[in-house]
Amino acid sequence: MEIEEPVRVARELVDAWYPDAVAAILGGSSVTARRTSHSDLDVVVVLAGEREPSRTSLRFGAWPVELFVHTEASWRWFVRREIPRRRSSMLSMCAEGVVILDRDGTGARLRDAARESTAAGPPEATPEELEDLRYGLTDLLDDLAGCAHAGERLFIVTELARRSCELILLRTGAWQGGGKWLARRVDEVRPGFSVELDGVVREALEGRPARLVALVDEVLAPSGGRRWEGYRRSGYPGSPAPGSHTGP
């Protein structure tokens, strides 16, 4: 499947549903070498004036579509909100996407802004954030050492896998991701890590956790290793901290 096909379909959708749009960007896997027969169309539509932003999942012909409708002001508001979280799907879609409609330069302006913000990277990790993740991983490793229940082991191991990737990305100043994007992000800074992690996770789920434990300790080492005794937080946090305790 050539890139021309998803671009054509996305433009047809925009013309049919939003004839007054000033810009549109097609992002996601459909315009990259990663696209598959299951790739959907991620379409960012920009309207003039004051409109309520929206996100809609739909089907256009044979194509599944994720449609993100914004004004330039709402687009910038969402991006400003996402950047402190170190994870922005909007930046990714627009930085890596294709401008399929641009009536007044808005499309190129937002694409360039997305590329600039993406290249600048997320906010630097604080010592507290790194320590929180170290503590969370240490707590999970302790839980795994004493775990004889297959169901509990499943969730401990998957949390170890996810948080190990998050620590690598946080420590290296890279953008975070979720789902398949977490694997892609971590492989960008440590090529092959997701495949290595997959192998040791499978062993751990079968009751052989030694290689997973060793890999997590390797991930922890550049940040100071395991952290448990002496870890302390006080006050009333506004939201759960990354790496918070895994118990009830």
Question: Where do the model's predicted regions map?
Answer:
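Conserved nucleotidyltransferase catalytic core and NTase-mimicking acidic/glycine-rich helix/loop elements
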Residues: 118-248
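Metal-dependent nucleotidyltransferase catalytic core
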Residues: 1-20, 25-39, 44-95
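Short amphipathic alpha-helical segments, especially helix-boundary/capping motifs
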Residues: 4-6, 19, 52, 67, ...
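Exposed alpha-helical structural elements
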Residues: 5, 9, 13, 74, ...
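Short N-terminal helix-initiation segments at or just after the protein's N-terminus
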Residues: 4-11, 99-108, 235-246
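Conserved NTP/Mg2+-binding pocket subregion across the NTase superfamily
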Residues: 56-57, 63-148
